[in-house]
């Protein structure tokens, strides 16, 4: 498995993983293929820690769901993983690092950053908003989103978003996707101050000098 889409659910914000899911993908000639037969989805126990109610309200994983499940430290990435794709993927990579996974050599591909580059004028770029956008507010999108915020469902939703990103940005292969993700992480517009919404390249020189002080 060279590339996977991965998602985690945690017991609290920036917490321990209580669910991890991933599926292998390939990118070839701007087309995405996902192998559902090799999808991995596992709940994990976290010792004496308790799931916060705020997190429970998001993913609906209860304490009773993780009783008797493997300890989170048992999680291993599939062999030969080079690329990990996900929405706000840095969060998930930090999470699996808590399992003892060496994430240093991993190339992270962030669909959140890519979506902001592909559709800069959208009001929101979370998974649900993007699914409604690419489906033009269809009933099918509503049905798909009923399982959102569980790791396995978010894998499929992220794959749907990525398919459209590949088309919009004309990305042909996985390494080009990684390069585009890295580039997309660099802000193009200012998000604060009197020049909020302005392109960084168009900012007055004196304002840029003030920012750099």
Question: What residue spans do the PLM features occupy?
Answer:
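A residue-level signal for conserved active-site and pocket-lining positions in enzyme catalytic cores
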Residues: 85, 154, 158, 197
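Acidic two-metal-ion nuclease catalytic site recognized across multiple nuclease folds
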Residues: 161-213
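Active-site catalytic microenvironments for nucleophilic, acid-base chemistry
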Residues: 99, 117, 133, 161-168
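Generic preference for hydrophobic/aromatic residues in regular secondary structure cores
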Residues: 17, 36, 118, 177-184
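Conserved non-catalytic scaffold segment of RNase H-like nuclease domains
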Residues: 1-108, 113, 120-149
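Charged, amphipathic alpha-helical interaction segments
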Residues: 60, 136, 156, 160-163
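Acidic, divalent-metal-coordinating active-site segment for phosphoryl/phosphodiester hydrolysis
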Residues: 11, 150-161
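Short runs of predominantly hydrophobic/aromatic residues within well-ordered alpha helices
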Residues: 111, 127, 155-158, 204, ...
């Amino acid at each position: 498995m060279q590339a996977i889409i991965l998602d985690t659910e945690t017991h609290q914000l920036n917490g321990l993983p209580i669910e991890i899911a991933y599926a292998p993908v390939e990118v070839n000639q701007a087309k995405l293929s996902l192998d559902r037969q090799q999808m991995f989805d596992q709940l994990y126990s976290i010792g004496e820690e308790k799931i916060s109610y705020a997190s429970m309200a998001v993913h609906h994983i209860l304490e009773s769901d993780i009783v008797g499940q493997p300890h989170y430290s048992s999680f291993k990435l599939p062999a030969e993983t080079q690329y990990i794709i996900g929405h706000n993927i840095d969060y998930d990579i930090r999470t699996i690092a808590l399992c003892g996974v060496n994430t240093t050599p991993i190339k992270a591909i962030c669909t959140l950053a890519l979506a902001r580059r592909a559709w800069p004028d959208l009001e929101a770029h979370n998974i649900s908003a993007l699914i409604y956008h690419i489906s033009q507010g269809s009933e099918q999108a509503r049905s798909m989103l009923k399982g959102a915020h569980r790791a396995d469902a978010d894998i499929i939703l992220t794959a749907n978003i990525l398919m459209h990103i590949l088309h919009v940005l004309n990305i042909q292969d996985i390494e080009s996707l990684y390069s585009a993700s890295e580039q997309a992480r660099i802000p193009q517009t200012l998000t604060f101050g009197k020049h909020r919404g302005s392109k960084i390249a168009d900012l007055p020189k004196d304002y840029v000098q003030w920012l750099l002080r």
